[in-house]
Amino acid sequence: MADKHLDARKGDSAHYQIDAAINRIAWAGDPDHNLLGILSTGQNIPTYTITAGGTSGQTSWLKKDADEILQDLMNMYSQVSKSTKNIERPDTLVLPTNIYTALSMKRVGDTADTVLTFIQRNAPFLKKIEMAAELNDDSVETNPYAAASNGSGVALLYTNDQKKLAIHNPMAFLQYPVQVRNLETIVPCEARTAGMIIPFPMSALIAIGV
């Protein structure tokens, strides 16, 4: 371990814990303090329930083929477009980590394409596809639809524009000078967040059951 002053390590630990707490709030909110996350029902972001594919008969994207997944995406995009009279055009898709990994490694038939590259080429409205462990089906701290077993992973389709949605942190992490109390050192730290601010909830969509 690199030589590092104890006070600096305490500060790093506090910074990590505060960042982790803000991240949880950004996704799931904090009902005790009336803070909303992007997946909080109070945000009024529309939801879309994944249905069984016509060929596979499955709902999970782990078991669907590329065409069925693409159809789900088209249905998701169409729901946003129709409900907003084509004003909102989401351009970013965030997937659970296991779904993203599987799609990036699973080939389409005997071609050189993976399911992920197939989607990127055939869904031109998507500028970016990302992954987030917070959306996993067992991420109970950040995904309201998750559970220890038999939970639902979710996908988030949204417009990557801070005018549409953004986390508001009035105070970034602040570390005060070291204080000595009763033969121990104290490193006071604080940060403040207002959670996710989403003026245009119809610009996003939460797909349940991927």
What is each PLM-predicted segment?
Residues 39-114:
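Extended, solvent-exposed, turn-rich assembly/linker loops in the middle of proteins
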Residues 11, 15-18, 74-77, 116, ...:
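Short, well-ordered alpha-helical packing segments
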Residues 19, 23, 98, 192:
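Residue-level marker of positions within ordered structural domains that often coincide
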Residues 104-210:
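Sequence/fold signature of self-assembling virion shell proteins
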Residues 1, 95-98, 200-201:
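Helix N-cap / beta->alpha transition motif
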Residues 22, 26, 85-88, 127-131:
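Residue-level signal for secondary-structure boundary elements
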Residues 1-71:
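Alpha-helical scaffold segments that mediate packing/assembly in large oligomeric complexes
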